[in-house]
Amino acid sequence: MMSFRFAATFAAILCVSTVALSPIAGAEAPKSLSSELKAADGTSLGTVTVTAAPKGALLRVEAKGLPAGWHGMHFHEKGDCSDAKFANAGGHVHRGDKVVHGLLNAKANDAGDLPNVFVGADGALTVELYSTLSSLDGAKHQATLADADGFAVVIHAAADDYASQPIGGAGARIACAAFK
């Protein structure tokens, strides 16, 4: 008799736990956009995914074939990676007219700034990071990524020093993922 009560109680707790941990009926998954990351010669390097979050954007990069070391990475204002130098991606995403770059700059307003990423000796990069400076829809007075001309995620040849203008000394654009 005792084991039946225990089993019934355990089953009831399990059912309640399952219902409590299940997604809320009718709740939508967050908006997520993915794009191919390309090298200057058009070679596919991997995938970049940007997911809408309540206070910004979650960015995930999975790539192979990049040069080893630290690299600057930024959100750029246009979803166009069609030229070899990725200049068509424009400047960093921003809300104002005059952009001041640098995560460590007290006067910074550059909404395209992201932390540096590290590529291992094998050329592989796997990173997931969060930005509160930009969002897919421009909510909370952030810069809008998914606007009419889209946006790009650009990886640079060198690390961003987070202070110098205009791009923190990060150098040439070596990889680009366009989002339209």
Features from the language model and the residues they span:
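N-terminal leader/targeting pre-sequences
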Residues: 21-180
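Bacterial N-terminal signal peptides that target proteins for export
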Residues: 1-12
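Short hydrophobic "helix-edge" motifs at membrane interfaces and signal-peptide entry regions
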Residues: 12-13, 65
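Hydrophobic h-region of N-terminal signal peptides that target proteins for export
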Residues: 13-23
